[in-house]
Amino acid sequence: MSEELLKVLKAAGLDVLSCMHCGTCTGSCPSGRHTGLNTRRIIRDARKNRATVLSDDALWLCTTCYTCQERCPRGIPITDALLELRRLAVRKGFMRPEHRRVSELVLECGHAVPLDEETKKKREELGLDPIPETVQKYPEALEELKALLKTCKFDELAAEK
């Protein structure tokens, strides 16, 4: 196992050797019933240091409901480990296109859903302020958010690699 991957998993409290591959996590997973998410396989791939574990789209299918973690007979924090693997994946440049697009929107306008003229008009018709109480309404707050995102290097993480 690569030193970096092992460090990430240890930080999540995941003792990869304690997993007995019983399948309780996968069998309990609500998302796994409808998608390609197989938590047991992801843990196994991480344990075997398979290069594909970070680029696997299934890593992003977890909804973080924590069912797998609650039911694991060994008490392995599986969801936390998946989140750590996601963080490492992003640092290594593996980000789903739709996540990258949302990141770009947040960097650009401070919100994942930009406010267009049609939405402003509909809000006015409903008797609402055309611009809701978000950073989009306050230019100085938007600039502060952009500065904060730059300081924490979010722009670099979101950039295409």
From Swiss-Prot:
Cofactor binding, per record: Binds 2 [4Fe-4S] cluster.
GO (cellular component) term, any one: cytoplasm
Pfam name, any one: Fer4_8
Family the entry assigns: Belongs to the HdrC family.
Gene Ontology MF, one: CoB--CoM heterodisulfide reductase activity
Keyword Iron-sulfur listed: yes
SUPFAM superfamilies cross-referenced by the UniProt entry: alpha-helical ferredoxin
Pathway: Cofactor metabolism; coenzyme M-coenzyme B heterodisulfide reduction; coenzyme B and coenzyme M from coenzyme M-coenzyme B heterodisulfide: step 1/1
Name used for this protein in its record: Ferredoxin:CoB-CoM heterodisulfide reductase subunit C
Phylogenetic lineage: Archaea, Methanobacteriati, Methanobacteriota, Stenosarchaea group, Methanomicrobia
Alphabetically ordered keywords of this record: 4Fe-4S, Cytoplasm, Iron, Iron-sulfur, Metal-binding, Methanogenesis, Oxidoreductase, Repeat
Residues given in the record as [4Fe-4S] cluster 1 binding sites: 19, 22, 25, 72
Domain 4Fe-4S ferredoxin-type: 10-40, 51-82
EC number(s) recorded for this UniProt protein: 1.8.7.3
Gene responsible for this protein: hdrC
Binding site for [4Fe-4S] cluster 2: 29, 62, 65, 68
Main localization, broad class: cytoplasm
